[in-house]
């Protein structure tokens, strides 16, 4: 969204969640000390008693999820527990992209049994033109949800919001880029990484010819007027490109023009695939034998769903080929966005609290049914949104996502 226009969202005055020592670079002076993460999320709008020390956590080893409801992995899922109408676990071996990808180029599903790390960014742009109201609430809600439902420990989350006193916790361009590097640092196969951005988004003319619409997607740090925006190409280079096969990165963008913020080559709508490399042709040839029917790791168990295919009109095959060559990834990257690139994200007043519509719908849909496929979840999010808004959710992926 153009940062000069007001867009969603009542401000929330809470503080950030504490982290452990940030190993790469300590802030110059650190008046805050924090040892153990609080076992329960704080309630209401009061910040926690312990100050956030601005340090980024070193992710702990993944907890054991056996017998815990709502957390499926390749070993503990409804299929293995006797429900054979549920999807089978994902293949653990590398899987081919199929036509349109470089020769011998594979991706690998994450078993999501390893470390869990999350980076959550919420920017209300206090005292700036175009101030927003609900972005910090989005982050507060998402962090609580990840902690209570998906086993993300508070000490393995970095929260950047512009209501925090510590300068290291402000969502400045430098802090956001540093935190993006932290998120993917030392990621190993079967780790689960989560990225959430709620704030202003926008578009800028595409300089390298890789976007269908001629524009790159951008996000606006709190200091964008001085430091500039962050382009999708840079987010892809930092957070997607370095990932090893078998690492899961889930990203949610609740901002205007966020439909392709991570620059991933496969884009899904509730009707089917919007952008894909020759997959429609492969479907006709019966080559879509690889099924990403995945016991859902972070998000939801894949269940049988038919996906319709159609091609998005692009500005030319050259841009298309360039994207496929440079933006596919051997990792397992999934992105949810609150608006397609030609839409704007909506304001929301849910139960008297200002929130981003996408963030709210994502959590609401999963609360109602945690065992959903990606495509079902996309439709559930659409249903949640359609009751109140015109906004259409979108799902992007670094690899073919097909549930048969």
Curated annotation (Swiss-Prot):
- InterPro entries per UniProt: Caspase-like_dom_sf (IPR029030), Metacaspase (IPR050452), Pept_C14_caspase (IPR011600)
Q: Which GO terms describe its molecular function?
A: cysteine-type endopeptidase activity
Biased composition of type Basic residues is found at 1-10
Q: Which GO terms describe its cellular component?
A: cytoplasm
Gene3D superfamilies assigned: 3.40.50.12660
By its UniProt entry, which Pfam families does this protein fall under? Peptidase_C14
GO aspect biological process, one term: proteolysis
Active site per database record: 200, 256
Q: E.C. number, please?
A: 3.4.22.-
Instruction: Enumerate the residue ranges of region (Disordered).
Output: 1-100
**Skewed-composition ranges (Low complexity):** 24-51
Keyword tags: Apoptosis, Hydrolase, Protease, Thiol protease, Zymogen
Q: Report which superkingdom the organism of origin falls in.
A: Eukaryota
Family per record: Belongs to the peptidase C14B family.
State the protein's purpose: Involved in cell death (apoptosis).
Tell me the protein's name.
Metacaspase-1A
Q: Which organism is it from?
A: Aspergillus niger (strain ATCC MYA-4892 / CBS 513.88 / FGSC A1513)
What is the primary gene name for this protein?
casA
């Amino acid at each position: 969204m153009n940062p000069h226009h007001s867009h969603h969202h009542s401000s929330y005055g809470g503080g950030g969640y504490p982290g452990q020592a940030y190993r790469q670079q300590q802030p110059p002076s650190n008046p805050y000390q924090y040892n153990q993460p609080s076992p329960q999320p704080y309630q209401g709008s009061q910040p926690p008693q312990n100050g956030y020390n601005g340090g980024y956590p070193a992710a702990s080893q993944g907890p054991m999820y056996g017998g815990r409801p709502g957390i499926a992995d390749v070993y503990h899922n409804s299929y293995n527990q006797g429900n054979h109408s549920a999807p089978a676990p994902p293949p653990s071996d590398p899987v081919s992209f199929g036509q349109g990808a470089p020769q011998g180029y594979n991706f690998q599903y994450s078993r999501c049994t390893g470390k869990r790390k999350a980076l959550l960014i919420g920017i209300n742009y206090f005292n700036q033109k175009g101030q927003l109201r609900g972005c910090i609430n989005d982050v507060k809600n998402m962090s609580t949800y990840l902690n209570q439902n998906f086993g993300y420990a508070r000490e393995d989350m970095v929260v950047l919001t512009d209501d925090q006193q510590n300068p290291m916790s402000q969502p400045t361009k430098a802090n956001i880029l540093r935190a993006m590097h932290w998120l993917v640092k030392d990621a190993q196969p079967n780790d689960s990484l989560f990225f959430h951005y709620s704030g202003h988004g926008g578009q800028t003319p595409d300089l390298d010819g890789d976007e269908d619409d001629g524009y790159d997607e951008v996000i606006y740090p709190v200091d964008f007027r001085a430091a500039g925006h962050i382009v999708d190409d840079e987010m892809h280079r930092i957070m997607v490109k370095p990932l090893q096969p078998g690492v899961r990165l889930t990203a949610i963008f609740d901002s205007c023009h966020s439909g392709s913020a991570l620059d991933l080559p496969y884009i899904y709508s509730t009707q089917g695939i919007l952008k894909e490399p020759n997959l429609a042709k492969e479907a006709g040839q019966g080559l879509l034998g690889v099924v990403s029917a995945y016991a859902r790791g972070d998000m939801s168990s894949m269940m049988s769903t038919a996906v319709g295919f159609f091609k998005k009109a692009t500005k030319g095959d050259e841009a298309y080929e360039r994207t496929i060559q440079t933006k596919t990834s051997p990792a397992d990257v999934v992105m949810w966005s609150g608006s397609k690139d030609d839409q704007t994200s909506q304001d929301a007043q849910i139960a008297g609290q200002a929130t981003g519509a996408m963030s709210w719908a994502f959590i609401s849909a999963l609360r109602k049914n945690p065992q959903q496929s990606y495509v079902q979840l996309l439709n559930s999010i659409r249903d949640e949104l359609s009751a109140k808004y015109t906004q259409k959710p979108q799902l992007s992926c670094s690899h073919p996502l097909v549930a048969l």
